[in-house]
Amino acid sequence: MKLIFDVSDKPKAGQLVVFALQQMLAILAATIAVPLIIGNGLTPAAAMFGAGVGTIVYILFTKRKSPVFLGSSFAFLGSMAAAFAGGVSMQLGMLGLIVGAFLAGLVYVVIAIVVKFVGVGWLNKLMPAVVIGPTVAIIGLSLAGNAIGDLVKGDVTKQVTEYAVSTDSGTPEIIETVSNVPVGSSYVALICGLITLAVVMLCSTYGKKTLRLIPFIIGILAGYAAAAIFTVIGNICDIGALKIVDFSVFSSYMLTDGSVSLKTFVSLPDFAFVSGLKGLKEFDFTYFATIFVAYVPVALVVFAEHVADHKNLSSIIDHDLLEEPGLTRTLLGDGVGSIAGALFGGCPNTTYGESVACVAITGNASVITIFAAAIGCMLFSFITPLVAFVDSIPACVMGGVCIALYGFIAVSGLKMIQDANLDDNKNLFVVSVILIAGIGGLTLTFGDITLTEVAAALILGILTNVMLSKKKGNAAKK
């Protein structure tokens, strides 16, 4: 595709700051979601810092030739939860996260060494475009439910208590369940999300050069402004349906001890290694085995997603990243970057499809933009009001952004198979299996290890391709 800024281009200083901010906004929602889901002492600020560190390591390993941001990996959510299973202390759990990320990164390093000696020819045969294309599409389509779920949801919540009768113990018992439900109307949230999406699309399609480069910033600001106006009116008139933005996050971040202090403006993130070092005395072989089993198999599957992301990015920038800088370097960058990032944030990192989509939609593939975004994430993590602002962006606004991002990932995957001959039954079956398995939500669970629909669909696609290729070869011989 036609790029406004190529990989080696350097935007002007003012532009660079704005472009970097846009990349940050594209990846931050998912990056901070992982620590919020896991809890146990993990914080969004530390995850932001770790993502920045991991991205810089990746850029250095790839010789500044691959424009993609590394963020917290959702594939390892089950693995991370296993690190805290069994009632272990927070300190031991943090150490487990770091050890797990090291093991996952080590898997990448080992594969990189193998690729260094045997090349990538085998990989292209195992995962041709007819396999990678629909897999990339599934990466986007599998996130569609998240985008739509967020699109109709505000962030202001209230506690609701529900009662149910349980007979599990043999005698009827009343079970009390407390949950947080949105106060705002789903229709008001939908309006804010659609305003965001509309502004993104209009800026990207009809905007002049500058607007076309920053559609997500303009879209998020427009959606946030609309949501804030609704919320202010809702607070003044006491109309719960209009309350979308949760402004209380500013006080929870900035007034931690109930008063204004230095932490109101600047604070040190809770780095994982600080707590992890305190867990060394509890670490034993049994716990190591638990972490090994939880992380290593998942890393093997995520490797395939790594290849898919880089083939997708290669098609966007019109340069084969698996050849130059080479799969060895991208794997080393991803693996070592993930280890470095987890030391600070606790979360293994991975190349982000949102970042790739941002590159494609804006036409800005400048690596210096990604580098600046990484530095920005690290700086943001220390500035309390900025962390609070990012956390206050309503789900519906990010849902509008994600429709564009996830949709573009899906479409770019489908574009990768446009040259494949789908009149050939072999190719038709490979694509069909991957799409239906992925969209259908096929997951495979082995103990504490869960293979996502993307991983399961990719594995089925590879097996189908290998099986039918062999059959076709045998038929040709006969």
Locate the predicted segments by residue.
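Early transmembrane hairpin of solute transport permeases
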Residues: 15-193, 382-385, 392, 396, ...
